[in-house]
């Protein structure tokens, strides 16, 4: 089964409540209709009901089964305001500021729906910058217990190379942290291993990569990766991993046997942790464009509830796919 087939199956099983807050965007309305039609999630739309239904009629799509929440006419609005003031107390947020934010920023309102137990996840960003989506997620929802770092992965589907590398590789971090510290690299690896199991359906073999394999080069950049491995060992994580591996040593069995013969994952890694955002972003795009891989992401990880960010150039179909991924992320038992 393809990756998308697996994700759709998990989303159908999960049937989670996913917020799509940017209802002024035609693509979001069309995607919501498709999600409802396929049964991939319980859709929650943020905005004026009359305006949303008018849009659906104009686009000739059905929103039957969607829940529409209007911040201007929401019975729990004051509770939301009070909770947001509590969450942002250290920053001195006033009730008036909280009210204004929730009325004017649907992504923040969507995050509060999750925080208050009225939704399970959110997909946003089609008409707002990544910074707005991540700010709402971090400030309102926060990170998972034991994880301080919000990061991302791309799931790379390489069906044509499955005999060499397997059909699925997980790349992280490719879109959030420019120069991660050792502790952040350890967090990224931990979250990526969890995503590999939950979303990609693979047993993670994690390689923390750099330009050196087992002492072949010396540099502070290499030291940072080695230290990340030490932190993971100290944490006694349950997934297989190794640090200080070059890409060929991580992926190619014959090279791994020469460069890192004692490694538990060399030549067989399927979760690749890049030492910087530059490396990760370049890496996934090279594999996508030159190897013809399908790239699914960025999938945000490390949050206390799933929130995923859309590109402002996204398609309707991609909103559907990312909603299915988010629904699967939100499923505790899946």
Regions found by a protein language model. Give the residues of each.
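Anion-binding alpha/beta catalytic cores of soluble intermediary-metabolism enzymes, centered on
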Residues: 1-266, 271-334
